[in-house]
Structures are given as C-alpha cells and as structure tokens.
C-alpha cells in the first residue's frame, strides 16, 4: 500500500538551549515547554495547520498554504518573546511530505529541519521556495542570508530571514547548523574540477 503524500508548507520549531535549561532549572524548563506547546497548538490551529510530530522540545507542523505557515511562525514568535520568554527558532520550506504511521517524513521535511538548525532564538528562517510564495505579500519583510550547503541535501539552498518588527535577523557569520564542513565542500569542488580537466 502506497503511503499518502502531500505537497505542503513545512514548519520546524525548536527551543534553543532546552537541555541546558533542564539541567539548570528543571521546573522552569517544564513550565516553558508547556507554555510553548499551548502557544504552538493555538496558532497552528488558528492558521489552518496541524502538528504532525513532536520531538521533545521541538515540532513539525504542516500547512496547505505558505502564507499561513509564515504568518503562524510570526505570531508564535511574537507571543513567545513576551514573558515568560521561550527562546524559539523556526525554519520553513515547501516540499512533498510522506505520511507513515502517523509520522511525516521526506526530503522537504529534512530541508525544513536543516534550515531551522541554522536559527537562533526569535528567528524565522525560510527557504527560497517559501520566499517565492510570499515575496509580494506586504505583510512580510525578508533579508537574504545567502546560500547554504546542508548535510545530506544535494544542492545549496538560499535562506532568508523574516525581518518583521521584533524578529531577529542573524548575522551569517554567527550561524551554525547542520551544514557541510568547509573541508567537504573543498573536496567536492576539487573532485568536480579534476573531472572537468580529465574530460578536456
């Protein structure tokens, strides 16, 4: 039996530094997690999405509309940067999602996860595919952070940061996430150039 597939706007969220929070003040960390879960579910439902998976202190949410997904992310961050502050990072991408045993998987999910991994607290980072869908919407402001080579992703992806009032636009040099090491990139370029030279 073929697993159900759906083209969707995918939103990944993650609480920054949650493991450290648990180690330093478990009671506070648990309270923040409950606040985060309630806020997430409220806004995802309001914007017509659904929470597909929870991952401890993170989540994967699915939307039929890129605009709805991005507005949901903005609303979540707006609420969670108020007291009690939850340091959240969010990444979004559009792609095909495969549903297996109540879990959402697929390349689109992996890319959204990689984009989220770049973020810092109070950031909303989006792929160029999401950006193409919202770039003419005056409700959103964006700043390009450049192209990134993510682990286990075939090609570089341009990532944009939402720059609406109150959101953090991180400096590229301060970003770290699930990206290929510079040595691997150099090795790939060397192999590619060697192949071209041999072909000549």
Please provide the spans of the model-predicted regions.
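Catalytic NTP-binding/metal-coordinating core of nucleotidyl cyclase/transferase enzymes
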Residues: 1-72, 79
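Bimodal feature
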Residues: 2, 35, 82, 90, ...
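Generic secretory/membrane-interface signal
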Residues: 8, 19, 51, 101, ...
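Short, acidic Gly/Pro/Ser/Thr-rich loop/turn segments
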Residues: 18, 99, 167-169
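Generic alpha-helix initiation/capping and coil-helix boundary signal
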Residues: 22, 62, 66, 105, ...
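Catalytic beta-strand-to-alpha-helix segment of the class III nucleotidyl cyclase homology domain
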Residues: 38, 45, 60-156, 160-163
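Hydrophobic alpha-helical segments, especially transmembrane helices
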Residues: 54, 90, 187-188
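Long, domain-scale regions corresponding to catalytic signaling modules most often appended to membrane systems
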Residues: 162-200
